[in-house]
Amino acid sequence: MINITAITTEHQLLKNIPIERVEQPDIAWYWVDFYGPEDTETALLRDFFHFHPLAIEDCFQHMQRPKLDHYDGYRFYVIHALNKETLETEEVDIFQGEKFVVTFHLHETPGIAKVRERLYASPDILKKGPGHISYMIMDQLVDEYFPLVYKIEDRLNEIEESRPHKTYGTLMNEVFDLRTDLLHLRRTIIPMRDLLYRILSLDHVKEQRETKAYFSDIYDHLLKLSEIVESNRDMTSDLRDSYVTLNSNRMNAIMMTLTIVSTIFIPLTFIAGVYGMNFDFMPELHWKYGYFAVLGLMAALVIGMLIWFVHKGWFNIFK
């Protein structure tokens, strides 16, 4: 599918015009958007626009890292959008010349449609030229990162609040799922941040105060997003470590309980074993108070060991 928007030298907005119309002398500049194009449409990149073969190849090689390449008469941007359902990265390619902007994306990208709607609602924006359209597309796609980042942050807070009511295994699975999502975000945001830094380093951007202000705004957004993502990754690490520590403490408490019980019953088992032997000549077996004496000895041993455990601080682990 191809959507073509153009503005005439008299600042008239033209929508959904045929590709041949953009060559007319009354066209000031135009925007051609290729969305899920067919073979005959993608051939226009080569036959109509005469873009460099390497740039055309990059359009079909998923996924290219966000970048900026300079060609004769135009710049080629590779930027990334995020699928709000799967957090998968989707590539958007921008060819920007003096009189045109050509966008290319294999999948539906709501951000592109929103930019087009803004242009239709405020045609005066088109007077700012094709460079401003490139800025608007980047700005829209980056702004759409924020709800995804905040959604993960909310999920992280929910996990923190529900920690006392969930099992260790459930919590760990949720934390690792969040870390995976944060990794996807980081792999998108950091390269985009590097791209914007490079754009701000261009001579023509440095010389144009308004253009620099626009792209600086996107760069600031990406800095904020990267800080939030890194902070959330640190929080998931802290949660993971606290869960591991908590589980280790629980295991230590269990092992201590078993150790105390075993330690208590070892001498009791020994005494019971001695007097359970079937010898005929054991003086205590025929003693009138032998049974009570053995029980008393066992009780004294239990009480003595418990006092010794308390003195050594063995029960502190249960506090």
Curated annotation (Swiss-Prot):
GO cellular component: plasma membrane
Membrane topology: Multi-pass membrane protein
CDD domains: TmCorA-like_u2 (cd12831)
Main location per the UniProt record: membrane
Alphabetized GO MF terms: cobalt ion binding; cobalt ion transmembrane transporter activity; magnesium ion binding; magnesium ion transmembrane transporter activity
Top-level taxon: Bacteria
Family matches, as InterPro entries: CorA_cytoplasmic_dom, CorA_TM1_TM2, Mg/Co-transport_prot_CorA, MgTranspt_CorA/ZnTranspt_ZntB
Record keywords, A-Z: Cell membrane, Membrane, Transmembrane, Transmembrane helix, Transport
Subcellular localization, as worded in the UniProt entry: Cell membrane
Pfam name, any one: CorA
Transmembrane segment boundaries: 254-274, 290-310
Family of the protein in this entry: Belongs to the CorA metal ion transporter (MIT) (TC 1.A.35) family.
UniProt xrefs under NCBIfam families: corA
The protein, known as: Putative metal ion transporter YfjQ
Native source organism of the sequence: Bacillus subtilis (strain 168)
Gene giving rise to this polypeptide: yfjQ
